[in-house]
Amino acid sequence: MIFVLLDGCRWDRTNISNDFKELQSEGTFFNNVTAAIPYTAGAVNVIFSGLYGKDNGIDAYSKLLALKKSIKVLPEILQENGYFTSCDLIHDKIVSKRGYDIHQAHKSGADYFSIHSELLKKSFEMASGKPVFTFLHHSLIHDVVVNEILPKYEYDDKSYYEQKEQNLARYDKLFLEACSYAKKIKKVIDSMVNSRDTIIIFLSDHGTASGERFGERNYGSYTYEETIRTFYLFIGQKILKKQTSDNLLSTIDILPTVLDLCGINVNFKLPGKSFADVIKEGITKNHGTKYAFSETGALHGLYPSPEKPNVFCIKTSKYKLIYFETPNEWSLFDLENDPLEQKNIF
């Protein structure tokens, strides 16, 4: 089981990359998975715990180290079931060391491909025949945004928001590089393992804004589609190929799905619902969830709140309702007729 996180990749740009289209043809692609928290630490801990931030302990930027001891996360569960586990991260505090045989981090601007290729090789060698779980964090988009964009433009610099096309063009170059990495790392994985028994999941933790909303230069400030709508691509011998679904899902659905795919039962309840049957048997019209929830509290911007979430939204396949706690304002959008969320109909 290999997770490949393409940090900051937007679901609505996947169509610009031939590399990603090629990968997409090899598996089942879900392009409407709502990130319960649209920034990396919060997002990944929801994915691995199957719990919302309020339940796993990490629901704010300031609570990076607050993962509850009373819960179990995916690497712990897999390790208890005989897996050798490893990860490479942008920062060693993104996920807890709990459940990892190898827990490492890379520096900003590192050679992600070489580092991840070496980690894969090391993991399979050290596993000595055990099944392997590896989490690879590709952070190019994050690195460039944090190191180049944020220092150059303050959140209230109007010039940034007035050059949306230029911002998106710059983003697309980074996105294409991320997809090129994804294709290359897939080849490395294929060369090392028995593809019959391997599941690869390419995923995004959140999208990256390009100046669509005043006050958000990257992500984590609001809960609009460009940052909370994410994608998951499942590839494996037992997974159907050339399937695409835009039915609504949530990141709390990922853990039960992965456990189902691994044939692992747990003795505790999870709020999400597995969609493993869709991956293996075929997409149905009614699969998915009726409602998905997302929340955030920004580090900067118009309504910074790093100590607790202060922007909340609930969405269906048709509508999204957002509550901005700090100014006490509501927004309602018709996602079918206004997918860019331009007209507040509240």
Regions found by a protein language model. Give the residues of each.
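Catalytic domains that recognize anionic headgroups
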Residues: 1-346
